[in-house]
Amino acid sequence: MKLKPLILSNWKLNGNCLLVKKILLKLNEKLKNKNNLKVVIAPPVIYLSEFKKYVLKKNIFLAAQNVDVNLTGSFTGEISPIMLYEFGVKYVIIGHSERRLYHNESIEDVTKKFLILKKFNLIPVLCIGETKKNKDDKCIENEIVKQIDFILKKIGIEGFINTVIAYEPTWAIGKKDSASPKYIQKIHKFIRNYLSKYDNDISKKIILQYGGSVNSKNVKKIISQKDVNGVLLGRSSTNIEEFLYILDIIEKTKKS
């Protein structure tokens, strides 16, 4: 099954109101009369309203970088899934390695977030991946399976309908080089094959993204891989020209 490429731009703690306006005006023009790409922007939550103001195209979607598992209450600084849903957010990143590292988020925490997002029809972008380079494929596979299984046991394979899985090896994030295309395909194929044991049809419909030092120089080889359905971009997506160039490359590559 051919899946429409999904490009997610994670701004992290970057950006300003002017950049929001510039990028959205360019994106609206860029995606005019095009329906073969899905572009998702995850700005800092304070800029979500600015994005909503300028989004004109149906294939540009809003995402949040995080969510709390509580719906209301005395939880200073948090944002609930209800708030995101009411605001028109469609995707929410969970399990990002930076959240695990700097905020001590555990597999249990990520699973709770996954479940609450599903309850409110928000699409989880579930980030998984190994923390260290390892020549032992079995160790890497076990680490990935552990992250997936925790959720599978709670919600079953049906819970992965309308879910994005972003494979992001921690050792490749924010570095000069990404993982090699061959390696990325091997891991993506493993993830899809593993999920297919539970339900082959569902596994074919799950969007598998790669994240970790993706840029205009390496994106063509990455997106050309059979089981790569999109990319999770970081710093490269806040550079307007670089971001638009990456979209061009993905569009042309997936057309051919």
Curated annotation (Swiss-Prot):
Family according to the record: Belongs to the triosephosphate isomerase family.
Gene3D superfamilies assigned to the protein according to its UniProt record, in alphabetical order: Aldolase class I
Subunit structure: Homodimer.
Enzyme class: isomerase
Record: active site: 96 (electrophile), 168 (proton acceptor)
MF-aspect GO terms: triose-phosphate isomerase activity
One GO CC annotation: cytosol
Domain of life: Bacteria
Signal peptide feature range: none
Biological classification of the source: Bacteria, Pseudomonadati, Pseudomonadota, Gammaproteobacteria, Enterobacterales
Swiss-Prot/TrEMBL catalytic activity: D-glyceraldehyde 3-phosphate = dihydroxyacetone phosphate
Protein residues bound to substrate: 10-12, 174, 213
Protein name, entry field: Triosephosphate isomerase
Residue ranges the record marks as coiled coil: none
Gene for this chain: tpiA
Alphabetically ordered keywords of this record: Cytoplasm, Gluconeogenesis, Glycolysis, Isomerase
Gene Ontology biological process: gluconeogenesis; glyceraldehyde-3-phosphate biosynthetic process; glycerol catabolic process; glycolytic process
Listed EC numbers: 5.3.1.1
Pfam family, one: TIM
Described purpose of this protein according to its UniProt entry: Involved in the gluconeogenesis. Catalyzes stereospecifically the conversion of dihydroxyacetone phosphate (DHAP) to D-glyceraldehyde-3-phosphate (G3P).
Pathway(s) this gene product operates in, as recorded in its UniProt entry: Carbohydrate biosynthesis; gluconeogenesis; Carbohydrate degradation; glycolysis; D-glyceraldehyde 3-phosphate from glycerone phosphate: step 1/1
Compartments reported by the entry: Cytoplasm
